[in-house]
């Protein structure tokens, strides 16, 4: 009997299950109850079980989005692909279906596929999921985590707070004092950080933050359109709007057009991301650039280096920069 077979037999006895059940758990197959799966995984941990190297690695990185439907996703894919190709690997995409936390079926599939590393975008991983991935030697990195990641969760992001500061200072330097803000999802750390940085810059300049002109969207163009109309139809509409991403900023541009306003003569608009579409909007969009491709590349390298046993920083934040185009100008006299 081989050493691995004997080990599986010992684990099966400890967990009071059959060796085939242990095999199902190791390979992420269905047909095992949650309670039994937990019992087997506890036995695996207590025995210090490590699957054979040829079963641990497949030459690809799994890149996980809530949904792959935007230029934002394309930029991240480019970065991850660059890192993968440099290591002789490919990239597999999967979706969690508009959920920050991947479900158990996704986790089972990842265990079956055995990628060399996993990069999750806008995600929170529960402790049980982290343990299952670690048990199978699958390193993971969260890119732009939805919440504040635990110290043991490697993550990559951009300097979101500083990006908010840069957007606010630009509008303040142009002379704007009545500014609306459309943040991204309020439960996402990056959204809150951008709004917090923006507000801090206003406080520093002694300019009141308009709580009545703050809205929260879902990073969608439709949100920018709807919430932009709300802000622009206030009794005292803002002279400028900072949107938490470029897609919502494009929605604000459309809202202004629908209300007969000209950008930037009647309204200044600042976005966030610097997607390619920002250069071709009408007018070209002033925005805060976060290096999405570089973020994807760094996240992939973190995961692959962890697979190779290298130890790197658990948190990487890349710098943002303001890109001034034609959607901002000094406020017109009213």
Task: Place the predicted regions along the sequence by residue.
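Alpha-helical recognition/docking segments in bacterial nutrient-uptake
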Residues: 1-3, 59-169, 173, 233
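N-terminal helix-turn-helix DNA-binding module of bacterial transcription factors
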Residues: 1-58, 332-334
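Short beta-strand segments enriched in small/hydrophobic residues
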Residues: 19-24, 55-69, 76, 170, ...
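Hinge/beta->alpha junction and helix N-cap segments in small-molecule ligand-binding domains
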Residues: 35, 65-75, 93-102, 145, ...
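Periplasmic-binding protein-like
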Residues: 114-122, 180-182, 214, 235-245, ...
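Short acidic capping loops at alpha-helix termini that bridge into adjacent secondary structure
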Residues: 177-178, 209-213, 263-268
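Flexible loop/turn connectors
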Residues: 227-230, 234-334
